[in-house]
């Protein structure tokens, strides 16, 4: 197998006009980004390296797009890409976000649920400032961050109270490996969780990135309310985000049968960064 493991830095002399990026996490979402690059949809960028577990998955992705396969995140950081796209996990973000940012590398995040931890969020922002880098939160399976952030700014400027909540309907089988599982969910629709976004990520670390991302643009993980409904025979997820102040109400409701939209949101974000016209 042609396994191009990278151990040294990458020379940017090859193409100074293009921004470079790497991918951390070579599963379903990471490969959507890699495939989009291969299709020519990220023409302003050069993909220089990937990493992920199992290593065989990273090797497969690297061969597909003809870039370096890094044995671990340290080797990818050593290549000094302009951006690292995270499509790995909440645990990866907790362990690596700060040092990536301190290295001066911009970080594009999918596993935003990690930032329900206010202390980690604060350290990541401080690391970004120290390293002169940016944290880019991909919209993932939802969207509307622009209007949600605008509404929150209005609330703060006019000293108005704001209410924000995220209501999700999803298939029952997604709750099988969680503390709320019971056999009744196979046949009966049920509300399995109601609480704050911070509480939700503690119980469902792999299912509520949407809630945490939305909360960061509105009232925060401690006060944004999350309601999760388990629905028998349901395919996909339906996320309804509502934020309201006196005189303004924003509702964003998005259904997706698979998580593919989260991977494509990264592609759209990278294109937006490189475009002469930015949509917020």
Predicted regions and their residues:
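Short, ordered loop/turn segments at secondary-structure junctions
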Residues: 53-55, 112-115, 141
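A short helix->loop->beta-strand "cap" motif at the edges of active sites that frequently abuts
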Residues: 67, 103-105, 130-133
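Conserved N-terminal Rossmann-fold NAD(P) cofactor-binding segment
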Residues: 54-79
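General beta-strand structural signal in soluble alpha/beta enzymes
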Residues: 86, 109, 135-139
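Active-site-lining helix/loop region of Rossmann-like oxidoreductase modules
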Residues: 24, 32, 136, 141-280
